């Protein structure tokens, strides 16, 4: 398969799965394995195109985010929102920096596909239960959460360092368990994704830039644009979808993909 087509496939997988609780990294790694991509440059490629999906969030929420930036000097609400995002990101930032080498090594484990599939299944079951049994929501606005709530969500986000867990899944499940409305949980997860993924982009580029060179520029550009456009579409429609149907469809998707993945691994062909 030519590199440009691989870039389109990976860009679509990234953009379509980054902001729904199904583990974009897990799907990307399973796709990479299925396509037989062994060049380390593709690992760095996967991290780099995540920034495209994040820019989809920035584009969609630009007016609200810009209002926060402009209002920081004079508006307490803007400063409070910025502080909640910062507090929510600190635990994952710290854990990611401290464990970057360990995480990279773990992702080279020969049993990584099995770990991802099991994580998808377990995460799907947990999401299914929480979506149906979560306590009644007390906080309804993703831009006006309490500092305590933001800190607790940040701790849940650390679970996303494990393969197949899902950053959005861990933050959404954590949010709902502590009384945040579904829509607000999804939106706050979007907002936290911006600094977290920009940080992951910068850290991985700093540590792995030697794995890529000018010959990869075209594929990276294609993957970046595709992930941006597909991420934009997903974010645009996700909030209304969640309000009407909840997260149950995504829970079942995780379970089905995990079971199929294990079947492909262990059933003789």
From Swiss-Prot:
What is this enzyme's EC?
3.6.1.27
- Could you list the residue ranges that cross the membrane? 42-62, 83-103, 110-130, 142-162, 186-206, 219-239, 247-267
Q: Which domain of life is it from?
A: Bacteria
Which reaction is the catalytic activity of this chain?
di-trans,octa-cis-undecaprenyl diphosphate + H2O = di-trans,octa-cis-undecaprenyl phosphate + phosphate + H(+)
Q: What class of enzyme is it?
A: hydrolase
Location comes to: Cell inner membrane
Q: Which UniProt keywords apply?
A: Antibiotic resistance, Cell inner membrane, Cell membrane, Cell shape, Cell wall biogenesis/degradation, Hydrolase, Membrane, Peptidoglycan synthesis, Transmembrane, Transmembrane helix
Q: Name one GO cellular component term.
A: plasma membrane
Listed NCBIfam families: PRK00281.1-2, PRK00281.1-4, undec_PP_bacA
Q: What else is known?
A: Bacitracin is thought to be involved in the inhibition of peptidoglycan synthesis by sequestering undecaprenyl diphosphate, thereby reducing the pool of lipid carrier available.
| Protein name as it appears in the record | Undecaprenyl-diphosphatase
């Amino acid at each position: 398969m030519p590199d440009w087509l691989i870039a389109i496939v990976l860009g679509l997988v990234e953009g379509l799965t980054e902001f729904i609780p199904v583990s974009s990294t897990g799907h990307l790694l399973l796709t990479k394995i299925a396509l037989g991509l062994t060049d380390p440059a593709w690992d760095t490629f996967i991290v780099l195109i995540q920034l495209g999906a994040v820019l989809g969030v920035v584009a969609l929420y630009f007016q609200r985010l810009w209002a926060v930036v402009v209002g920081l000097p004079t508006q307490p609400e803007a400063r409070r929102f910025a502080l909640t995002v910062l507090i929510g990101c600190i635990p994952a930032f710290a854990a990611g920096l401290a464990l970057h080498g360990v995480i990279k090594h773990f992702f080279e484990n020969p049993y990584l596909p099995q770990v991802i599939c099991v994580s998808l299944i377990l995460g799907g079951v947990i999401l299914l239960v929480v979506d149906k049994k979560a306590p009644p929501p007390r906080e309804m606005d993703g831009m006006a959460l309490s500092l305590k709530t933001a800190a607790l969500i940040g701790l849940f986000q650390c679970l996303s360092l494990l393969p197949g867990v899902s950053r959005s899944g861990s933050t959404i499940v954590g949010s709902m368990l502590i009384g945040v409305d579904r829509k607000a949980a999804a939106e706050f997860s979007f907002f936290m994704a911006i600094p977290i993924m920009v940080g992951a982009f910068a850290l991985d580029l700093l540590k792995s830039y030697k794995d890529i060179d000018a010959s990869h520029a075209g594929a990276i550009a294609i993957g970046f644009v595709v992930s941006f456009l597909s991420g934009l579409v997903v974010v645009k429609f996700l909030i209304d979808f969640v309000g009407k149907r909840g997260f149950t469809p995504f829970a079942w998707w995780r379970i089905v993909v995990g079971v199929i993945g294990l079947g492909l691994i262990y059933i003789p062909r």
